Amino acid sequence: MEQQKQHVIRAVRADEWEKVRGLRLDALRDPVASLAFLETYEQAAAKPDEFWQERAAGAAEGVDVAQIIAEAPDGRWDGSVSVFIEDVGTSDFLGQVVDVDQAHVVGVFVRPGQRGSGLTDALFEAALEWVWARQEPVLGRARLFVHEENERAAGFYRRFGFRASGLVVPKPDDPSAKEHEYVISRP
């Protein structure tokens, strides 16, 4: 936990799009990226600057999406988590109709050297603080999906208070693999 105290946990700013892109590309180079992300390094690297500029600007506005980062004293970003709102009646990433106003946690990444330091806890605390502070609509839960083979991540989510909902879906880019939905209810 001592490492975490050296980091500033905060939302991204619109002008930080290059760091948003850099951290995402680093995350997609991680050995477990194929379990944790639906996008490949090659797909992300091919996206134009405008994509990253829009992503950073949207997250900085914090209306329907937020990206929380862990910034080291030297300015390096050591982790990130993103959250977006899923409104009732919209379609989720699987094409299913959303039946409850909720948040969806995605893009969880902490650099290998910082794992176990408390950064993931700090990122999730800030992300869920953003979720629970939302007033319109008030969100009753947050959810995320975890690959069936990503036990380290699943263990963290359970320890943090998420519970398996029982919903199991095929991984969009590999239907032979399964992803489990985990949810946490508003305190």
Language model region names:
Residues 138-187:
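C-terminal "cap" of GNAT-fold acetyltransferases
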Residues 18, 87-90, 151, 171:
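Flexible, glycine-rich phosphate/dinucleotide-binding loops
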Residues 8, 104-106, 142:
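Conserved Rossmann-like nucleotide-binding pocket used by diverse enzymes
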Residues 8-22, 34:
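A short beta-loop-alpha structural element at the N-terminal edge
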Residues 107, 111-125, 136, 148-155, ...:
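Conserved glycine-rich acetyl-CoA-binding loop
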